[in-house]
Amino acid sequence: MSGKFLIFGATGSIGSSLAEQMNNAGYDNVHLVSRNQDEVEAIASKYGFSFTVADVLEQGYTEKIKVDLEDALGIAYCIGSIDLKPFKMVTENDFNKCMKLNLYSAIEAIKAYQEALKKNKGSVVLFSTAAVHRGFTNHSIIASAKAAVEGLAISLAAEFAPNIRVNCIAPSLTNSKIAQPMLKNTAIAEGIAKAHPLKRIGEGKDSASLAKFLLTNESSWITGQVIAVDGGRSKLA
C-alpha cells in the first residue's frame, strides 16, 4: 500500500507527539505538514518521514501537499488555536480567522484526499476542545469554531461510512507553545491544573495516544465519536 498517514500541525505539542508515537509503533509511512520549516524538517529527519511545508491559512494550500503526496491512509488534523476575548471585543474577523484555521482548512484537507481515503478505507481524526462542552468565559470564538468541527466530524462519519471513519478528540488545556501565555504564570497554571479532577495540565502525548489509535486500524469499529481527553474537566469538575 503506497499511501501515508498525514499529520497536520506536526510541529505542535499534539502533532509532534503523534509523529513520535507513530514512529515508536513501527509506522514509517507518515507524512508531516507544518508551516514551520526548520522544526518539521528536524522531526521528519529524526523519524525518516516525508514532509511538506505549508500554511493551512493560505489559499489552495492542499495543492502544495498533493505534489508531495497523492495517496492517503488517514488524516490527523492536529491544528488548533487559543483565541480568548471578552465577547464585546470580538470582531467578525476574529471568528472568520478562527473558523478558517480550525474548520475550513480541515474541510479542504479532507476533500483533497477523500477519494484516496475511500479507496484505502482510511480514517480522519479532528480536534475540538473541552470548551464546547463546558462553558468558559472569553471562549466564544474558539468554542464556536470547534463546535462546528464536532458537527462536521459526526456528519461526515455518517456520510462516509462504511469506507472512511471520522472521529474527533476534545482536549482540555494542553501544555503547548500556544498555551504558554497562560501556563508561564505559575499561579495560573496551578489553578488550571486544580480545576481538573486529575489535577494536572494535559500533555501532547495524552491526546496523541488516542489520535494514533483512532487513525489506525486498531480502532476499525469506531466512527462518529467525540472523545474527551480532558482530565475529567468536561464531565466531573
Outline where the language-model segments fall.
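N-terminal Rossmann NAD(P)H-binding glycine-rich loop of SDR-like oxidoreductase domains
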Residues: 11, 19
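Substrate-binding pocket helix/loop in short-chain dehydrogenase/reductase
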Residues: 86-87, 91-99, 189-192
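Alpha-helical segment proximal to the catalytic Tyr-Lys
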Residues: 115, 157-162, 220
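Catalytic loop of short-chain dehydrogenase/reductase
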Residues: 123-148, 153-161, 173-174
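Short C-terminal tail/terminal secondary-structure segment
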Residues: 134, 212, 223-237
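Short, flexible catalytic-loop segment of classical short-chain dehydrogenase/reductase
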Residues: 166, 170-181
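A conserved structural motif in NAD(P)-dependent oxidoreductases
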Residues: 196-207
